[in-house]
């Protein structure tokens, strides 16, 4: 534990107290603070000037990062008939209908994202208490309830990420891995910031973006200029 603590302290020393870094500087620095033996995820944390208690101030959606997240996601598709072949051809890891529902009811959850055709949602709805709390329930707003399974699965495999405000109005989202080039991290960072600005709720008052921080999985937060 002491060794891990020292590595974290050394990483903290790289971050100048009170300084706000440019996006380019922050991406170079966050790579240096990723000192673990595994390929740490680089995360973006944005504090927004919204009150998520109100439905018209909630920020939620999905987007494809230009360079993906560096993580391969296991995709489950709820479908039947011809749509099964489409999902399989698109690269879905698991495809099925009632038998998959029964499997999940039995405790199986070895997937990262679930997609469903609209006609399957009546069946999938029975899994609400299992999938809902885990953020795995297909949602039309996120593009995971759709007839275009080719597009949905392809985008997820290409690095589609979901973003949403927590109870405090913060958005936490991965933008890549420590092994990524700083330039690719910056392009992913900018794409997500641009998206958050584009989906600003009309009801949000005052300053929208309050703070931006990036960090590696086990590293300190690095403040970024607004």
UniProtKB/Swiss-Prot annotation:
Keywords associated with the record: Repressor, Ribonucleoprotein, Ribosomal protein, RNA-binding, rRNA-binding, Translation regulation, tRNA-binding
Single GO term (MF): structural constituent of ribosome
Signal peptide: none
Coiled-coil ranges from the UniProt annotation: none
Organism domain of life: Bacteria
SUPFAM superfamilies: Ribosomal protein L1 (SSF56808)
A matching Pfam family: Ribosomal_L1
Biological processes, Gene Ontology terms: regulation of translation; translation
Family: Belongs to the universal ribosomal protein uL1 family.
Self-association state and partner proteins as the record states: Part of the 50S ribosomal subunit.
Purpose of the protein: Binds directly to 23S rRNA. The L1 stalk is quite mobile in the ribosome, and is involved in E site tRNA release. Protein L1 is also a translational repressor protein, it controls the translation of the L11 operon by binding to its mRNA.
Protein's recorded name: Large ribosomal subunit protein uL1
Species annotation: Selenomonas ruminantium
GN (gene name): rplA
């Amino acid at each position: 534990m002491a060794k891990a603590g020292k590595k974290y302290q050394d990483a903290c020393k790289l971050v100048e107290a009170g300084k706000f870094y440019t996006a380019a500087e922050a991406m170079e620095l966050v790579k240096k603070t990723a000192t673990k033996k595994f390929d740490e995820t680089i995360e973006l944390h944005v504090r927004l000037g919204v009150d998520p208690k109100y439905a018209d101030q909630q920020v939620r959606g999905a987007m494809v990062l230009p360079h993906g997240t560096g993580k391969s996601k296991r995709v489950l598709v709820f479908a039947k008939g011809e749509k099964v072949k489409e999902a399989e051809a698109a690269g879905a890891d698991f495809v099925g209908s009632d038998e998959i529902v029964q499997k999940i009811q039995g405790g199986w959850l070895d997937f990262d994202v679930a997609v469903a055709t609209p006609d399957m949602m009546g069946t999938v709805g029975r899994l609400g208490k299992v999938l809902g709390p885990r953020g795995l329930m297909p949602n039309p707003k996120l593009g995971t309830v759709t007839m275009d399974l080719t597009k949905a699965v392809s985008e997820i495999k290409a690095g589609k990420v979901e973003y949403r405000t927590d109870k405090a109005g913060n958005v936490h989202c991965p933008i890549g891995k420590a092994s990524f080039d700083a330039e690719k991290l910056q392009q992913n960072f900018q794409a997500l910031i641009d998206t958050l600005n584009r989906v600003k709720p009309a009801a949000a008052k005052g300053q929208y973006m309050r703070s931006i921080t990036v960090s590696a999985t086990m590293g300190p937060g690095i403040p970024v200029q607004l």
